[in-house]
Amino acid sequence: MNVETIGLWAGAVWNALNDANGSFTVKGLKKTTKLKEKEVFAAIGWLAREGKVNVTEIEKDVEVNLI
């Protein structure tokens, strides 16, 4: 895993969120992007660091929204 790969995962997650009008759970992102859970979380971290997503804990999952 390197920075370039994580950036590609972040692009896939961002595109999925954008296509879904900005909101998904981690479970939904895994299903939509076909990424593994650790890859989805790495991508979310990348996007959060760039200020592009909000992350909210909802019961046993995490919801991610575009800003």
Residue ranges and their predicted role:
Residues M1-W14, K60-V62, I67:
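Short alpha-helical segments that sit at the start of domains
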Residues I6-T32:
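Short amphipathic alpha-helical interface segments
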Residues L35-W46:
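Short amphipathic alpha-helical interaction segments
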